[in-house]
Amino acid sequence: MAYAAFRSIGAYVPSKILSNEDLSKMVDTTDEWITKRTGIKERHIAADGEFTSDMGAKAAQIAIERSGIEKNKIDMIVCATISPDYFCMPSTATIISTKLGLENVTAFDISAACTGFVYILSIAKAFIESGMKKNVLIIGAEKLSSITDYTDRGTCILFGDGAGAAIISATDDKSEAIIDIHTGADGEFADLLMSPNGGSGSIHDTLDQEAKSCFMQMKGNETFKVAVKTLTKDVIEILQDNNIESSEIKHFVPHQANLRIIKAVGDALKLNDEQVVLTVEKFGNTSGASIPMAINDIYESGKLKAGELMLLDAFGGGLTWGSALVPFSPLK
């Protein structure tokens, strides 16, 4: 039987920084107000003319180079994004495939908001274990600045741009394998986080209303309560299902939405500060890109070593959620 191994990680962060001080000149807010409520100090913003596919391709190129796997051996690309280059078609994954010079690969996008990376990790695992694919490139890429209302202080303080990518490949060695992935969704809470843009559910009569509805909308307090409850329940279940103690987790890599949410879940699991990966302060919430960007951060800082166990955990619009137990298994 083939198993799926997490081989490499890469990320791309735009150079432009939007600080809390910058935002205080745009909306009624302060650095203190933002930091106290979110833990965010700054976020990165894509340059004019820089698209989601550009960022995704740059992150992917790094992941490919680090993997030790020949580029032409990649047989599938899956991109998680809620800010694609084009909302209808083509998919961002197909555009990325061309930018990477890859031909005849399966390529498609999925939309699971901030849980996107866990979802595409589960897709890669399933395709590899079925024997249908051998080397899958998964990408979380977001240009959230393109769907952020910079007159709404409740959302514009949260979001940033960036991309992260990983190579998942087949292995015969079970010790290298992704251990387990949980995913779920509940549409009952769909209105907590949404971007009611021009889909078939649109009810707007004018183009101005339609354009405004493309921006992300969030019910912050309700989302916080549901997120903490759902994330805590999910990570406890995946640990119990696999007879793994929280002390065995080397790196807890949650979706970087809000420092208070992350700390609440970490406290529920009795994790120490060294186990919890935090990048929300410098990147903000980058939705489907946040987990791979956080993994890349600990990789580049030398904290992530071969064989170490990561617990990934995410929650997003839909509502969606997911968790994964993932050993870091670079090719020897």
UniProtKB/Swiss-Prot annotation:
The last Arg residue of the ACP-binding site is essential for the weak association between ACP/AcpP and FabH. It is an enzyme of class 2 (transferase). Signal peptide: none annotated. The active site is at C114, H255, N285. GO terms for biological process: fatty acid biosynthetic process; secondary metabolite biosynthetic process. InterPro entries: ACP_syn_III_C, ACP_syn_III_N, FabH, Thiolase-like. The gene is fabH. It catalyses: malonyl-[ACP] + acetyl-CoA + H(+) = 3-oxobutanoyl-[ACP] + CO2 + CoA. Homodimer. The lineage of its organism: Bacteria, Pseudomonadati, Campylobacterota, Epsilonproteobacteria, Campylobacterales. Belongs to the thiolase-like superfamily. FabH family. This is Beta-ketoacyl-[acyl-carrier-protein] synthase III. One of its GO terms (molecular function) is beta-ketoacyl-acyl-carrier-protein synthase III activity. It comes from the Bacteria. GO terms for cellular component: cytoplasm. It holds the Pfam family ACP_syn_III.
